[in-house]
């Protein structure tokens, strides 16, 4: 089953706490262009559905960033969970090598 997630580029200077209040989860994409990383935001409801269907470091996810015209295969590298609330706090994606 192929999972597809659409993200947005995180606005410059935006505060993570404000993003979470607005219903977004901060995220990063690593390895898409060498050592460069991109700060992203993902809708919190999309993240909840993703975490029910995907396993960390095992499930391949199609990530789409329309603002950058980038689409590629990634894996869910890390999920940080809020210790008191038990909700996703931050997620990291790792681009897989094109093969």
UniProtKB/Swiss-Prot annotation:
It comes from the Bacteria. GO terms for biological process: translation. It holds the Pfam family Ribosomal_L25p. CDD domains: Ribosomal_L25_TL5_CTC. SUPFAM superfamilies: Ribosomal protein L25-like. Keywords: Ribonucleoprotein, Ribosomal protein, RNA-binding, rRNA-binding. GO terms for molecular function: 5S rRNA binding; structural constituent of ribosome. GO terms for cellular component: ribonucleoprotein complex; ribosome. Part of the 50S ribosomal subunit; part of the 5S rRNA/L5/L18/L25 subcomplex. Contacts the 5S rRNA. Binds to the 5S rRNA independently of L5 and L18. Belongs to the bacterial ribosomal protein bL25 family. This is one of the proteins that binds to the 5S RNA in the ribosome where it forms part of the central protuberance. This is Large ribosomal subunit protein bL25. It comes from Nostoc sp. (strain PCC 7120 / SAG 25.82 / UTEX 2576). The lineage of its organism: Bacteria, Bacillati, Cyanobacteriota, Cyanophyceae, Nostocales. The gene is rplY.
């Amino acid at each position: 089953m192929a999972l597809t997630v659409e993200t947005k580029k995180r606005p410059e200077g935006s505060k993570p706490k404000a993003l979470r209040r607005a219903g977004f989860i901060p995220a990063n994409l690593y390895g898409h262009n060498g050592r460069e990383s991109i700060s992203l935001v993902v809708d919190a409801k999309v993240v909840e559905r993703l975490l029910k269907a995907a396993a960390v470091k095992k499930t391949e996810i199609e990530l789409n960033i329309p603002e950058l015209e980038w689409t590629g295969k990634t894996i869910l590298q890390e999920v940080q969970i809020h210790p008191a609330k038990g909700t996703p706090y931050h997620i990291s994606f790792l681009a897989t090598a094109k093969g």
